[in-house]
Amino acid sequence: MNQATPTKHVFVTGGVASSLGKGLTASSLGSLLRSRGLRVTMQKLDPYLNVDPGTMNPFQHGEVFVTNDGAETDLDIGHYERFLDTDLSQIANVTTGQVYSSVIAKERRGDYLGDTVQVIPHITNEIKERILAMGGTGEDGRSVDVVITEVGGTVGDIESLPFLEAARQVRHDIGRENCFFLHVSLVPYIGPSGELKTKPTQHSVAALRQVGIQPDAVVCRADRELPPSIKKKISLMCDVDQDAVVTCADAPSIYDIPKVLHREGLDAYLVRRLDLPFRDVDWTVWDDLLRRVHHPKEEVTVALVGKYVDLPDAYLSVAEALRAGGFAHEAKVQLRWVASDECQTAAGAARNLQDVDAICVPGGFGVRGIEGKLGALTYARTHGIPTLGLCLGLQCMVIEYARNVVGLEKAGSTEFDPDTPEPVIATMAEQKAFVEGAGDLGGTMRLGLYPAALKDGSIAREVYGSSLIEERHRHRYEVNNAYRDQLEEAGLVFSGTSPDNSLVEYVELPRDTHPYYISTQAHPELRSRPTRPHPLFAGLVGAAIERQRELRFPIDETGLRREPEPDED
């Protein structure tokens, strides 16, 4: 794109109800524009007063997505990264808490020269600065062609008003020809009358107009396709072109949404409206992904043993990484959500895990459900079930091994009991002040991208195909180095450490002991992409498929498969 052409800004708003899929709609549009050869980046404006979601309850907010530079962000940032296949930074997520904190700090410094600080212009100017900052140049010096900004919340909510006003002012500042407003709304189907109702969408657009924004296009979320008559009515009553009324009916997979929007002509309309270079969409990569999604050759069941399974969004990136691991093998991954409490006893673990092909133990905080995670890991280790542990999953893997193999019956973590007699997991030295209450909890963990050196001959080294890797982290606790020798002598392999060997990053069992039993202190799910599955998850699914193929072989007393005797054929 010509460098003289200004960056275009696309704002995505939502109406009628929350959880309509604004983030997925925005991500899919970004994917389409990127497939047309445009440089696209994305941003989320969140109207809550928290500075970031780092200390929020997973049951309320879902997962916390960590960027390379260590920002704790909204889970929609994960959608953006997966659909665009790019890495975003902390400026991709703006919250009301960040905006107000910055404005108040400036006021205290005297930056406003005695002005009365108000929502308009001071808060809105701060928001505008953060929106426009996304349109800078990339590492290669080229400017971004399109910035897609999702405005969180629902039009009409008081919390979103400053963000909507800032977006309106951005349109005024950069020119209408460089700005596009996309409104996502609900068109409900009323069963008894057999009708699709447009009134909620009309009222939602009316509320948007009240704050000075006229949408350029409307994406209608529904459980079925909209007939032309309904589209024509929405076009007339909402004052948008009929070509800009887009149906986005429920799809079999979230990865179908770009095709749905393209079929409806949304990307072509936007490109014409913003006078962007018109190139055909290159479907090469996405078509291959959809083939793997819809036409798998294998199917495996993976148990996700977690504390927050009542809200699957708490493990959104883990679930998507597991599914992507299946795509690598043209396999469908069926997730079984297992509450860790249900695996606290041997009988409970067997009941929930005896027929799964693999197990994933994800991260979390606090003592609740820990004994269940340990029970699940004991079952996985002794029955040869391929297992992947993430963050807390690594710590539980070490505790379980210390108790049941090494003989440290009181092994534990200082997170759960500061006075545990055998702290095989301990607080990181630089984290002790925060844990003891001497500092803020928010934003103070070991966050962001950190390197690890992998041991030759290990599973980790094999699946990564490299001896030095980088992964994103979010933790305060680590394997206690005082117990490393004792654990290694008992057969546990510390297959990856920080380059200076001070922090354990990967733990596993040798392949001759277990087919695939590995964990990492990092969060590799955050770097997985549907088109580039993460090697740890692909390795887990590969091991699960291999185990399926060997199910006809008996299991010996160690829980491992053995070759059948000649008379067993």
From Swiss-Prot:
* Annotated keywords: ATP-binding, Glutamine amidotransferase, Ligase, Magnesium, Metal-binding, Nucleotide-binding, Pyrimidine biosynthesis
NCBIfam families, alphabetically?
Answer: PRK05380.1, PyrG
Q: Does Magnesium appear among the keywords?
A: yes
What GO terms fall under cellular component here?
cytosol
Question: Of which family is this protein a member?
Answer: Belongs to the CTP synthase family.
What function does the entry list? Catalyzes the ATP-dependent amination of UTP to CTP with either L-glutamine or ammonia as the source of nitrogen. Regulates intracellular CTP levels through interactions with the four ribonucleotide triphosphates.
Taxonomy of origin reads: Bacteria, Bacillati, Actinomycetota, Actinomycetes, Propionibacteriales
Q: Which residues form the active site?
A: C391, H523, E525
User: What is the E.C. number?
Assistant: 6.3.4.2
One further remark on this entry is:
CTPSs have evolved a hybrid strategy for distinguishing between UTP and CTP. The overlapping regions of the product feedback inhibitory and substrate sites recognize a common feature in both compounds, the triphosphate moiety. To differentiate isosteric substrate and product pyrimidine rings, an additional pocket far from the expected kinase/ligase catalytic site, specifically recognizes the cytosine and ribose portions of the product inhibitor.
Q: Which reaction does it catalyse?
A: UTP + L-glutamine + ATP + H2O = CTP + L-glutamate + ADP + phosphate + 2 H(+); L-glutamine + H2O = L-glutamate + NH4(+); UTP + NH4(+) + ATP = CTP + ADP + phosphate + 2 H(+)
Say which species the protein is native to: Nocardioides sp. (strain ATCC BAA-499 / JS614)
Annotated pathway: Pyrimidine metabolism; CTP biosynthesis via de novo pathway; CTP from UDP: step 2/2
Instruction: Name the chain's protein.
Output: CTP synthase
Query: Which residue range or ranges hold the Glutamine amidotransferase type-1 domain?
Result: 301-550
Q: Where does UTP bind?
A: S18, K197, T198, K199, P200, T201, Q202, K233
Q: Which GO terms describe its molecular function?
A: ATP binding; CTP synthase activity; glutaminase activity; identical protein binding; metal ion binding
Mention one GO biological process in which this protein takes part, according to its record.
Answer: 'de novo' CTP biosynthetic process
Q: Sorted alphabetically, which InterPro entries does this protein's record hold?
A: Class_I_gatase-like, CTP_synthase, CTP_synthase_N, GATASE, GATase1_CTP_Synthase, P-loop_NTPase
Q: What does the subunit section of this Swiss-Prot or TrEMBL entry state?
A: Homotetramer.
Task: Quote the record's binding site residues for CTP.
Answer: S18, D157, I158, E159, K197, T198, K199, P200, T201, Q202, K233
- Recount the known activity regulation: Allosterically activated by GTP, when glutamine is the substrate; GTP has no effect on the reaction when ammonia is the substrate. The allosteric effector GTP functions by stabilizing the protein conformation that binds the tetrahedral intermediate(s) formed during glutamine hydrolysis. Inhibited by the product CTP, via allosteric rather than competitive inhibition.
Using the UniProt record, name the top-level EC class of this enzyme in a single word.
ligase
